[in-house]
Amino acid sequence: AKLIAQGTASEPIVFTSNQSAGSRNYGDWGGIILCGDAKINVPGGEAQIEGGPRSYYGGTNDNDNSGILNYVRIEFPGIPFQPDKEINGLTMGGVGKNTNIDYVQISYSGDDAFEWFGGCVNAKHLITLGTWDDDFDTDYGFSGMIQYAVALREPNIADVSGSNAFESDNDASGSTNLPQTSAVFSNVSI
């Protein structure tokens, strides 16, 4: 399946809380999860996505196309689905390089804003605002390139993990599984 969310600068697509304006808060809803077929570094090459009990990602197709997210705002997402398994603002598992992600803003996420679990999708023009946890989190062999990103952090907002602009792991156990996480971020302001 693919998600096609093709907005414009003057008419962005907005995914937001179902609460009325003024009552919206961090984690009002889960977030967006994309599951692709690109390489990840877990044994067997496939894994269950956090927050998707029946959804799997990973494979051998680095040319995977999981859709288009252009001129998109994701507001008030990010929930703990289970202990240590959260839904982020935008969760990408094994998403390949033919996926188009450009001009995406995530605001007031109750967990990470963007998290990549493997895959090799490239993305440009990413903005985070007031994220509770990490702004950009890379795991499981993610090897994409991110260019033009801005993270605006609230100085008094953080979850119990400490929250950072970046978190990058090869995997949760610190293995040397291949492909190793090797994301490239350029033109970033924190």
Question: What residue ranges belong to the model's regions?
Answer:
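Beta-strand/loop edge motif enriched in small/polar residues
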Residues: A1-I190
